[in-house]
């Protein structure tokens, strides 16, 4: 269990700082299965999860949705047969905040729940 998994998201506003390059490297060590991606000049965290069927993929999607509601921080979720792609970023700052890394770690924790 990572330190990030046990952390709580903080309220984030438009003037909150994005993670620095140094913070990005450090935080990525705690979520090595995630990939930083850039979409429309916005850095995001993304991971694809594989499942045996649609039912398992949908159940995982719902677990991630429950986490998102608990923390009041919501991802992009693409649910397909046997696969869910989860993308985290902070809309208010158009980039990555520590909250995104916390939620990525929490997402990892519910894969086999």
UniProtKB/Swiss-Prot annotation:
Lineage: Bacteria, Pseudomonadati, Pseudomonadota, Gammaproteobacteria, Alteromonadales
Natural source organism: Idiomarina loihiensis (strain ATCC BAA-735 / DSM 15497 / L2-TR)
EC top class, as a word: lyase
Superkingdom, taxonomy of origin: Bacteria
Listed GO biological process terms: tetrahydrobiopterin biosynthetic process
CDD domains found in the cross-reference section: PCD_DCoH_subfamily_a (cd00913)
Regions crossing the membrane: none
Catalysed reactions, as listed in the record: (4aS,6R)-4a-hydroxy-L-erythro-5,6,7,8-tetrahydrobiopterin = (6R)-L-erythro-6,7-dihydrobiopterin + H2O
EC number from the UniProt entry: 4.2.1.96
Signal peptide as annotated in the record: none
Any one GO molecular function term: 4-alpha-hydroxytetrahydrobiopterin dehydratase activity
Keywords tagged on the record: Lyase
Family to which this protein belongs: Belongs to the pterin-4-alpha-carbinolamine dehydratase family.
Entry keyword annotation includes Cell cycle: no
Annotated protein name in UniProt: Putative pterin-4-alpha-carbinolamine dehydratase
């Amino acid at each position: 269990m990572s330190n990030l998994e046990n952390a709580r998201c903080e309220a984030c506003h438009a003037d909150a700082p994005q993670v620095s390059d140094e913070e990005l490297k450090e935080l990525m060590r705690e979520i090595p299965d995630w990939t930083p991606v850039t979409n429309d000049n916005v850095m995001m965290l993304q991971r694809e999860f594989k499942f045996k069927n649609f039912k398992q993929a949908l159940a995982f999607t719902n677990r991630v949705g429950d986490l998102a509601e608990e923390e009041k921080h919501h991802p992009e979720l693409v649910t397909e047969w046997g696969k869910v792609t989860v993308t985290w970023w902070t809309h208010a700052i158009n980039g990555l905040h520590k909250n995104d890394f916390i939620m990525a770690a929490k997402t990892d924790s519910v894969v086999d729940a």
